């Protein structure tokens, strides 16, 4: 018999997330047995109001959530809420391929337990997983690096809050790329001048 183990209390519905699937025999410790008896349910039933969709439809979505979630540590615990939300987005594959910037906002805005959440970083990583050329990744490290270099080199006009607007974030990255291309051009020119000096004839 398969159980779904959830990591939080039922009355904290907005915080509940599905962590892993366990076989009944795998739950041996006292804590595991308590979790099994308190929170374990059969596949396909309700978890505090969250309906688990048919595995046929939800499994591929869960895989696509888990890859960026695990690789980039986005800490999305309520993955079934997110999966259900993603399944409801119209023309998702087509928009991923075309690089539709608005898709990041739509993917990131998820209702969990009646409360609106915005998983901005996760949404950029999900999109980038499918189309890395069109969807650069935002996370706190990228933000810190961009702010640092802009403070030093003034390569673009933006503030920290602007980076949470995906369209502006992409513009800033393009500015940063152009800035670095100029630096690269200068470096190559100086290097070439040193290594291959023109003869004075």
From Swiss-Prot:
It comes from the Bacteria. This is Uncharacterized protein HI_0787. It comes from Haemophilus influenzae (strain ATCC 51907 / DSM 11121 / KW20 / Rd). The lineage of its organism: Bacteria, Pseudomonadati, Pseudomonadota, Gammaproteobacteria, Pasteurellales.
């Amino acid at each position: 018999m398969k159980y779904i183990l959830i990591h939080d209390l039922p009355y904290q519905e907005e915080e509940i997330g599905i962590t892993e699937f366990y076989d009944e025999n795998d739950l041996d410790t006292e804590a595991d047995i308590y979790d099994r008896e308190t929170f374990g349910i059969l596949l396909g039933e309700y978890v505090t109001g969250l309906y688990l969709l048919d595995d046929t439809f939800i499994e591929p979505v869960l895989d696509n959530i888990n890859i960026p979630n695990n690789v980039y540590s986005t800490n999305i615990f309520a993955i079934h809420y997110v999966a259900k939300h993603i399944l409801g987005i119209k023309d998702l594959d087509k928009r991923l391929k075309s690089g539709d910037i608005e898709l990041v906002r739509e993917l990131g805005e998820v209702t969990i337990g009646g409360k609106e959440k915005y998983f901005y970083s996760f949404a950029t990583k999900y999109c980038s997983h499918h189309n890395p050329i069109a969807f650069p990744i935002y996370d706190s490290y990228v933000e810190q690096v961009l702010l640092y270099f802009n403070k030093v080199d003034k390569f673009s006009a933006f503030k920290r809050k602007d980076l949470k607007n995906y369209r502006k974030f992409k513009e800033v990255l393009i500015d940063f790329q152009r800035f670095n291309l100029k630096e690269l051009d200068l470096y190559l020119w100086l290097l070439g001048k040193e290594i291959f000096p023109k003869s004075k004839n």
